[in-house]
């Protein structure tokens, strides 16, 4: 479909929808059953920084059908991570339903629910609260000031919060004059549905610190959350999650990053790593390592816990690597020895195309990485001279280099994980910094690291 002036089409459609809904479900049939909201949307956004409003929607005008997830499935995942949950209720363009709200709310019992729709009539607010929404979205792009005030007043009378959405400087000025308590900056152009996160940069700095600011649309990576963390109080994230096959995996990638727990030797440690948010789990097949794991143990772990596993090898015969790939589902091979370009090229020819190759580069003060990068690899892992040493290298060596395909390793722990994340690498590789002893991971240390990454601050208790 042509996206030009899609907003005008949606509003025209909404007027007709309201007329029809009023006939089949008149206000008089349910108004007496409406109760006041008992979940505090504003407080939920203040509890953890950054706040995360995770969205349930099945369809998007710009992307089409996103998924076939049912609301129960999504609620069970979102309740573990969300400050609040947004539910799209527009039927024609987003395949939403008001009936989704109580389903999600009854499972996610701690989170307030944001009803996200194109509100133009008081009837819709009554309907949203009847279905147990705790807050609504009011878009200044489709409302005049007097309409906004009337709808806001009604929402407040039902103890509901209002997220005021703006798209440009003119709407921001209106929101400020209207004393909006929560302002959502939509990074999507509502006329053609293009996205630019620079909209948040341009507008957020002009808003009072006493106002809660939410960045909406186009948020799809942990690095974006990290970059915007001092500009806004939270994020509304929808399509970047709902378009992925593995929803919980997608949530982890956005809220804590592409992180790896290496040196796994036990099923319980792999399960813990996945539950806390690790995207990758590492098996060290180097026999000289204190964290060496044999094939039998690795096979048992992969059968019991499904995640993206990385096999770490040191100067190993390619035939041995191929044999192990046949036995366990490895996402990538990490080369941690003295493998040269010829070795890498030969390896790539022998292993399945779906298996990536990562190459570790050892750094010290005398050797900069620019002269030691390899071709034909998917990622580089920057580490200390000796992996698993528990000592970080001098991160100053990374200055002025593109780190988007670099995984940072070497002595990462609770004390330096936030500084490490601020470097902007693709991901972080944790090993000795979260251990009780070599190969045995510490639950508390692991939890605190991922909680710190989630909240973008060091948490030691």
Curated annotation (Swiss-Prot):
What biological processes does GO assign it?
A: L-tryptophan biosynthetic process
Provide the alphabetized UniProt keywords.
Answer: Amino-acid biosynthesis, Aromatic amino acid biosynthesis, Decarboxylase, Isomerase, Lyase, Multifunctional enzyme, Tryptophan biosynthesis
Known EC number: 4.1.1.48, 5.3.1.24
Print the organism lineage.
Bacteria, Pseudomonadati, Pseudomonadota, Gammaproteobacteria, Enterobacterales
The identity of this protein, by name, is Tryptophan biosynthesis protein TrpCF
Pathway note: Amino-acid biosynthesis; L-tryptophan biosynthesis; L-tryptophan from chorismate: step 3/5; Amino-acid biosynthesis; L-tryptophan biosynthesis; L-tryptophan from chorismate: step 4/5
Domain of life assignment: Bacteria
Annotated stretches, region: Indole-3-glycerol phosphate synthase:
1-258
Q: Which residues form a coiled coil?
A: none
Protein family according to the UniProt entry: In the N-terminal section; belongs to the TrpC family. In the C-terminal section; belongs to the TrpF family.
Question: Which parts pass through the membrane?
Answer: none
Renumbered to this chain, region (N-(5'-phosphoribosyl)anthranilate isomerase) spans 259-461
Functional summary from the UniProt entry: Bifunctional enzyme that catalyzes two sequential steps of tryptophan biosynthetic pathway. The first reaction is catalyzed by the isomerase, coded by the TrpF domain; the second reaction is catalyzed by the synthase, coded by the TrpC domain.
Q: Which reaction does it catalyse?
A: N-(5-phospho-beta-D-ribosyl)anthranilate = 1-(2-carboxyphenylamino)-1-deoxy-D-ribulose 5-phosphate; 1-(2-carboxyphenylamino)-1-deoxy-D-ribulose 5-phosphate + H(+) = (1S,2R)-1-C-(indol-3-yl)glycerol 3-phosphate + CO2 + H2O
UniProt cross-references to CDD domains, sorted A to Z: IGPS, PRAI
NCBIfam families, from UniProt? Answer: PRK09427.1
Q: What GO molecular function terms would the record report?
A: indole-3-glycerol-phosphate synthase activity; phosphoribosylanthranilate isomerase activity
Against Pfam families, the record matches this protein to: IGPS, PRAI
